[in-house]
Amino acid sequence: MAAACGVSVGSIYNYFDSKAELVGATVESVWCEIFHRPEDEAVFRDTEACIAWMYERMEYGCKQYPGFFTLHSLGFMREDKLDGKRRMQQTWQHILDGLCMVLKHDARIRPDAFTEQFTAEKVADVLFSLMLSALLRQDYDPTAILEIIRRTLY
C-alpha cells in the first residue's frame, strides 16, 4: 500500500497501529464506497427500489473489487482482530439501520404488515441476511427477494 501511495511504510503506521487496523479500515472504506448514498434519494423511500439498488451495488462491488465478497474477506477478522470486527459490525449496522428506515417510511407497505413478532427490524435483519448470502454466492439477481417483499409487505 505504501508503494502504491508513494510513501514510506513507516508513514502508513503513523496512522494505523497495526496491519489488522489498516486492513480493517480498508475493508470499512470499501464497504462505504460500494454502498455510498445514491444521487437519487427516492431509492430510500421504497423497499423494492432500495433492495434493487443494493443488489446493483453488490454487483458493482464484485466487479470493482474482485474477491472482496468472499468468505475470507467477510470473515477475516474472526481471529482476535477486535478493531476490524468492530468496524465491520458498525458498517453492517449502518446498512441495517438504513433498511429499517426504508421499511418504516415506505408508504406502499400495508398498515398491518408489521406485528410485534414481525417487526421492521426483524424484516431488515432477514433482508440483510439474504443479501450476505447473495454476496457469498455472487448472485446479484434480486428477483426472488423482491417477490418476497411484494407478497409479505405490500
Predicted regions mapped to residue ranges:
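Short secondary-structure transition hinges
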Residues: 59-98
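Hydrophobic alpha-helical bundle segments that form small-molecule/ligand-binding pockets
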Residues: 80-81, 92-124, 153-154
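Helix-turn-helix
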Residues: 1-21, 25
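Short alpha-helical scaffolding segments that buttress acidic/His motifs in well-ordered protein cores
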Residues: 71-72, 127-131, 149
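Short, basic, alpha-helical segments at the C-terminal edge of helix-turn-helix-like DNA-binding modules
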Residues: 28-35
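Amphipathic alpha-helical interface segments
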Residues: 11, 15, 57, 61, ...
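Hydrophobic alpha-helical connector segments
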Residues: 25, 39-64, 120-124
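Secondary-structure edge/capping motif, primarily at the C-terminal ends of alpha-helices
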Residues: 38-42, 69-80, 134-138
